[in-house]
Amino acid sequence: MLKEFEIEPLLKDKAPHQTKAVVAMSGGVDSSVAAALLHNLGYKVVGVTLQLYGTDGNANARKGACCAGQDIYDAKRVAESVGFPHYLLNYEEIFKKEVIEDFASTYMRGETPIPCVRCNQTVKFRDLLQVTKNLGADVLVTGHYVRRLEKNGEVKLCRSIDKSKDQSYFLFATTQEQLKLLRFPLGGFYKSDIRKLAKYFSLQISEKQDSQDICFVSESYSKTIAKLAPQSVQKGKIVDVNGKVLGEHSGIVNFTVGQRKGLGIAHNEPLYVIKINTENNEVIVGPINVLMQKKILIKELNWLEQPKEGMEVTVKLRSSHVGSLATIHSTDEKNKACVILNDDYFGISPGQACVAYKDEQVIGGGWICS
């Protein structure tokens, strides 16, 4: 059966039995299959799981999460059944600082965060790559649905074959230096293939559901942020774009740009959240046309391939976005760029990522400022 699931060699100049691969194991089906597949192909696999949260027991029984409680047990059990070493590293304090606190502070700036990108950018890639080097391994392998293509010494990050599972949007902040050591063996497969492989390898987690939503949010977003930043639930005013007071809100944590439902105010036309003014603790609302825009300013740029001035690309403005045609332009501000969409787009949210593609290839991107 394994002949149906061929992958590119992890290293072109080393045979599998000479190649040591650290596999980041979350306890889910994808990373477990990646580890089992490589082990069966003869690679020297070392499984590593990061304990990111939940040592207080709060997240241990939560379904659809990862990297805590049951998931750690599942990763260890897979390693034992397949027959490769597995290590558990406690990264809870680092995760709290780099991801959870950033999540809360982003909301407090009136933005909508994507903690999964921050986690990949810091804990999972930056720190795990250092662990990989410390263990004397050749590569770091993850179960992400994304493809890494290498030609003439140049590495490209590309969309997964399975577009319904593609995770390239969440990996836009990966650097060229990191890509040299990273490998994504599942990018050429469909999720259904991975389920088949899990059963073929007799993995106990073959039917385990995929992780969903934000792993450390055990309640609602608002309750989680309220615990991290109590000031986010202070009452304030809801005003229109001209500053007229329309009502009162119960905390900015309950609102996000583009939101229509749950505003708690009556008006003669539908109103949407236009902006969250954290300085004045105000939620600014207006008609839908105010939310339609073509021009986007992005910051903290990461280009896997430096775009030329006016380069035509397709951009994704949220993970579920199918993509919009656009051009990329330089600005006078350091580490910022301007993206001009061909057509108006509704509800562009500061704090989200703007990721540029050229066909299947990830060019790079940045965080939306405005």
UniProtKB/Swiss-Prot annotation:
GO biological process, one term: tRNA wobble position uridine thiolation
Entry superkingdom: Bacteria
Catalytic activity annotation: S-sulfanyl-L-cysteinyl-[protein] + uridine(34) in tRNA + AH2 + ATP = 2-thiouridine(34) in tRNA + L-cysteinyl-[protein] + A + AMP + diphosphate + H(+)
Keyword Phosphoprotein appears in the UniProt entry: no
Region (Interaction with tRNA): 165-167
Record EC number: 2.8.1.13
Matches recorded under InterPro entries: MnmA-like, MnmA-like_C, MnmA-like_central, MnmA-like_central_sf, Rossmann-like_a/b/a_fold
Keywords carried by this UniProt record: ATP-binding, Cytoplasm, Disulfide bond, Nucleotide-binding, RNA-binding, Transferase, tRNA processing, tRNA-binding
Site, Interaction with tRNA: residue positions: 144, 352
Residues that hold ATP according to the record: 24-31, 50, 143
Subcellular location: Cytoplasm
Keyword Nucleotide-binding tagged: yes
Pfam families: tRNA_Me_trans, tRNA_Me_trans_C, tRNA_Me_trans_M
Function: Catalyzes the 2-thiolation of uridine at the wobble position (U34) of tRNA, leading to the formation of s(2)U34.
UniProt xrefs under PANTHER family: MITOCHONDRIAL TRNA-SPECIFIC 2-THIOURIDYLASE 1, TRNA 5-METHYLAMINOMETHYL-2-THIOURIDYLATE -METHYLTRANSFERASE
Family indicated by similarity: Belongs to the MnmA/TRMU family.
Designated name of the protein: tRNA-specific 2-thiouridylase MnmA
Upper taxonomic lineage: Bacteria, Pseudomonadati, Pseudomonadota, Alphaproteobacteria, Rickettsiales
Name of the gene this protein is made from: mnmA
